[in-house]
């Protein structure tokens, strides 16, 4: 969110003075010691390179880009669905201009519709969407290209953590971890996953009313790629919804990473797992 906000501000008004604060490192310096093969287990880095830095928590993901309002957030609570889809297409155009693929998977193909009918026989409901798989390595390349595009147009301050935000003199005063203070007229906060708890405290300090989103508890299961090839070759990732018979609880499949790799994440000392999947066949698992 912060990167694309900076991109759009510079596109609309290149004369603006924009400073982007990032607690992690630049896109070229980010490196998880597990992924680099230096260690086997998470060593609790003070700032997790998988979660923080230019590109955020998604920088090393498998790079799925979904064209849908059926899942992926609650933007339609604030913007009409047609406008949301226009914005999704607009962001995709930015990505394509910086090297993203134009190949798209869809639930509208004959194969996908046959898959949806078969799923209904088991009371599984396939959500409708188009999806691009950018690939972990291509995702990184796109972000590097965007960084090269922006680095001389606005100011990035890496390894810079904010501690407090306060209203002051018609703007905002941001206090940094090293004690420095920055004043700005307008402030856009994009704390990402790793900064969610911190930002909750900031909002309370500013007297903002908060709402709780639902929390999904997920289990990552590693299987041979051939088990789900009949699905992933057609739609790449299927969002299948099922409601349990006794209590009506909703469960779903999500975050498929065909031929992928399970990776560790560290969110303020809490270890979780994610999945990476490369576009290059030579980098895939089985």
Please place each PLM-identified region on the residue numbering.
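Dinucleotide-binding Rossmann-like beta1-alpha1 core, especially the glycine-rich loop
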Residues: 53-105
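Residues forming the flavin
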Residues: 1-72, 109-286
């Amino acid at each position: 969110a912060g990167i694309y906000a900076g991109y759009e501000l510079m596109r609309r008004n290149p004369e603006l003075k924009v400073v982007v604060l990032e607690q992690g490192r630049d896109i070229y310096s980010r490196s998880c010691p597990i992924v680099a093969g230096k260690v086997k287990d998470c060593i609790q880095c003070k700032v997790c390179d998988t979660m923080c830095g230019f590109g955020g928590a998604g920088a090393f993901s498998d790079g799925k880009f979904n064209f849908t309002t059926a899942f992926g957030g609650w933007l339609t609570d604030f913007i009409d669905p047609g406008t949301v889809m226009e914005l999704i297409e607009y962001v995709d155009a930015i990505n394509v201009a910086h090297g993203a693929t134009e190949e798209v998977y869809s639930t509208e193909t004959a194969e996908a519709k046959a898959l949806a009918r078969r799923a209904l026989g088991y009371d599984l409901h396939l959500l409708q969407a188009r999806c691009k798989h950018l690939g972990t390595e291509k995702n990184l390349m796109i972000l590097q290209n965007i960084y090269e595009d922006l680095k001389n147009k606005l100011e990035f301050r890496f390894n810079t953590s904010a501690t407090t935000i306060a209203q002051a003199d018609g703007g905002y005063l941001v206090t940094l971890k090293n004690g420095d203070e920055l004043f700005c007229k307008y402030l856009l906060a994009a704390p990402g996953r790793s900064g969610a708890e911190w930002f909750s405290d900031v909002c309370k300090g500013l007297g903002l009313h908060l709402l709780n989103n639902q929390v999904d508890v997920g289990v990552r299961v590693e299987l041979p790629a051939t088990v789900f090839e009949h699905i992933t070759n057609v739609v790449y990732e299927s969002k299948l919804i099922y409601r349990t018979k006794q209590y009506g609880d909703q469960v779903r499949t999500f975050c498929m990473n065909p031929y992928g790799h399970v990776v560790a994440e560290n969110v303020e000392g809490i270890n979780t797992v994610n999945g990476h999947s490369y576009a290059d066949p030579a980098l895939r698992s089985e």
